[in-house]
UniProtKB/Swiss-Prot annotation:
<feature type="active site" description="Glycyl thioester intermediate">
    <location>
        <position position="86"/>
    </location>
</feature>
<dbReference type="GO" id="GO:0005829">
    <property type="term" value="C:cytosol"/>
</dbReference>
<dbReference type="GO" id="GO:0004842">
    <property type="term" value="F:ubiquitin-protein transferase activity"/>
</dbReference>
<dbReference type="InterPro" id="IPR000608">
    <property type="entry name" value="UBQ-conjugat_E2_core"/>
</dbReference>
<dbReference type="GO" id="GO:0006511">
    <property type="term" value="P:ubiquitin-dependent protein catabolic process"/>
</dbReference>
<keyword id="KW-0832">Ubl conjugation</keyword>
<feature type="domain" description="UBC core">
    <location>
        <begin position="2"/>
        <end position="149"/>
    </location>
</feature>
<dbReference type="GO" id="GO:0005737">
    <property type="term" value="C:cytoplasm"/>
</dbReference>
<dbReference type="GO" id="GO:0061631">
    <property type="term" value="F:ubiquitin conjugating enzyme activity"/>
</dbReference>
<comment type="similarity">
    <text>Belongs to the ubiquitin-conjugating enzyme family.</text>
</comment>
<dbReference type="GO" id="GO:0036211">
    <property type="term" value="P:protein modification process"/>
</dbReference>
<dbReference type="Pfam" id="PF00179">
    <property type="entry name" value="UQ_con"/>
</dbReference>
<dbReference type="InterPro" id="IPR023313">
    <property type="entry name" value="UBQ-conjugating_AS"/>
</dbReference>
<dbReference type="GO" id="GO:0032020">
    <property type="term" value="P:ISG15-protein conjugation"/>
</dbReference>
<comment type="pathway">
    <text>Protein modification; protein ubiquitination.</text>
</comment>
<dbReference type="GO" id="GO:0043130">
    <property type="term" value="F:ubiquitin binding"/>
</dbReference>
<dbReference type="GO" id="GO:0045087">
    <property type="term" value="P:innate immune response"/>
</dbReference>
Amino acid sequence: MMASMRVVKELEDLQKKPPPYLRNLSSDDANVLVWHALLLPDQPPYHLKAFNLRISFPPEYPFKPPMIKFTTKIYHPNVDENGQICLPIISSENWKPCTKTCQVLEALNVLVNRPNIREPLRMDLADLLTQNPELFRKNAEEFTLRFGVDRPS
């Protein structure tokens, strides 16, 4: 009950004043603990398209962190092939119940725009970004153009 009340309030707040990097924020009709959103990164190579997200809140929220998953494929060292994200702010050891979803989404936007090669989920992409940044950016741009979602106007 507490989780849904807080989640509803956070959703309403974000819908009233959405950050510039987020669009189409909504919850599942049947479950307010599941949100969908469109992330619009502003840095190359990800700025060319947008990416669908699914945000799932556990019943224990805010005492347990939400889970965020990319449902659009993304070529990124901190996102695995299944869309799972390595985002320190929502890790069990770092999570604080006072953290709001808007802060989590801001951290995600920063991470997408500036990959963290110290905590990769895809070591191959972290290595490529370190050893050959131009090739990484070229591959990421091609992947983004192929799999990304058109950005809303």
